[in-house]
Amino acid sequence: MVLAAITLKVGAYGFLRFILPILPDASRYFAPAIIVLSLIAVIYIGMVALVQTDMKKLVAYSSISHMGFVTLGLFLFSGGYLNDWALQGAIIQMISHGFVSAAMFMCIGVMYDRLHTRNIADYGGVVNVMPKFAAFMMLFGMANAGLPATSGFVGEFMVIMGAVEVNFWVGALAALTLIYGASYTLWMYKRVVFGPITNPA
């Protein structure tokens, strides 16, 4: 939880607080390359998360994909574009991701304590045993998926809007992660919480 909530943000905070103000010319020069790398991270890691069978690995890969949004937003701002949408979206995404990913890892930890496995196929029917927990996990699962009216949506949407202002195709590629995020998070939630009971424990 500490890794997801705090440590992952150190690099992005370092960019925002030190690298961008101290080395503005270098930031502007390398911005196109970092924007491309961020898009690769957002899309490719989202695809990797889709095939995970381990809950913890799935949430970990989704965290990497979300942090790709943060670097994308930061360098859309610093690359000479001065895009406020992207910068504000990156900051909101950092804050949101800190709470959401920590909560998701906590949910996985609670389930692991009961069955001592993180394999998605070993779970099912959690809502019948722990309905309040299922509601809690649904709330943060929706935010992790980036569904509207959640904090996860606000940051990603602002970065995408900023990207569209700079280049339509950058924004379109970044928007793919909303599809991936909804796919892997909701699939995991449906299987674990509403799926058939495979283990009565």
What are these regions (language model features)?
Residues M1-P196:
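Hydrophobic transmembrane alpha-helices and their helix-loop junctions in integral membrane proteins
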Residues T198-A201:
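Short, intrinsically disordered, charge-balanced linker/junction segments flanking boundaries
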